[in-house]
């Protein structure tokens, strides 16, 4: 009998597409050639941003403007950039009451005050409970800054936030003037019989949602590629504190070539 470790969000090593990535590497090097002497820039390799946009369109029905996409070294770098640039020490951040330990560690490092919101293990974060918390803060003249949520296959419960709850969450964000950071790290590994509901980013009409995704869960954490999507002016605000001169163009080009041939 095989042992299966549920402690880390990693694909099965036996499914890693080594041969296809070797082919993608050859194509990427051939296409990039001498351009690899240049820095990729804050937004990252355009070919991978185009793939991110196309993959989002396949699932959500609308493309992402590639100038709103920034490639990062995994989704944790995305979260670090977003939270570091939108929050100040002492800010109140709302999260699901059970949440990924890496995000908690980052929020603690930034000296924020974390408030957990009740959720159930099927439909996700409870918007009624969230509203009660927000009304209580409002009565004390306290204003939370943002809510961090994992709507698809929430870690650790596996809950999928229903469409109704997603819409309520956006309404509450508008009413109480909150940002939403949508961590969609597990959205690509859905095996439920019905399609998962539309992303908060797609449903958002008031520029409150910043979308985060990763290639770690569908390809491999060692690839270290993720991305965030933010509309103006927040895309520039978030990238303002970025000093790495961009994520590896070579790694990005290899993954882009791979997914162009393997979008399904």
Regions found by a protein language model. Give the residues of each.
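N-terminal "arm"/small-domain region of PLP-dependent enzymes with the aminotransferase-like
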Residues: 1-43, 54
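PLP-dependent aminotransferase class I/II
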Residues: 209-211, 215-264
């Amino acid at each position: 009998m095989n042992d299966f470790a549920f402690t880390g969000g990693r694909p099965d090593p036996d499914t890693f597409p080594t041969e296809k990535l070797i082919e993608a590497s050859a194509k990427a090097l051939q296409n990039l050639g001498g351009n690899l002497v240049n820095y990729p820039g804050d937004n990252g390799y355009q070919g991978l941003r185009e793939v991110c946009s196309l993959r989002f369109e396949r699932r959500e029905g609308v493309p992402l403007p590639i100038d709103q996409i920034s490639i990062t070294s995994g989704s944790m770098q995305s979260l670090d950039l977003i939270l570091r640039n939108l929050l100040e020490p002492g800010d109140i951040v709302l999260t699901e009451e059970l949440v990924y330990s890496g995000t908690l560690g980052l929020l603690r490092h930034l000296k924020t005050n974390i408030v957990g919101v009740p959720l159930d293990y099927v439909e996700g974060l409870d918007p009624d409970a969230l509203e009660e918390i927000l009304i209580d803060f409002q009565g004390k003249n306290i204003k939370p800054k943002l809510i961090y949520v994992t709507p698809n296959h929430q870690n650790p419960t596996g809950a999928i936030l229903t469409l109704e709850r997603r819409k309520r969450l956006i309404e509450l964000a508008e009413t109480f003037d909150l940002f939403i950071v949508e961590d969609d790290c597990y959205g690509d590994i859905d095996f439920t019989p019905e399609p998962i509901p539309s992303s908060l980013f797609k449903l958002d009409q008031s520029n409150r949602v910043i979308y985060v995704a990763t290639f770690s869960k569908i390809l491999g954490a060692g690839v270290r590629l993720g991305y965030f999507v933010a509309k103006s002016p927040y895309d520039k605000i978030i990238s303002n504190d970025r000093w790495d001169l961009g994520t590896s163009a070579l790694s990005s080009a290899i993954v882009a070539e791979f997914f162009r041939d393997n979008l399904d």
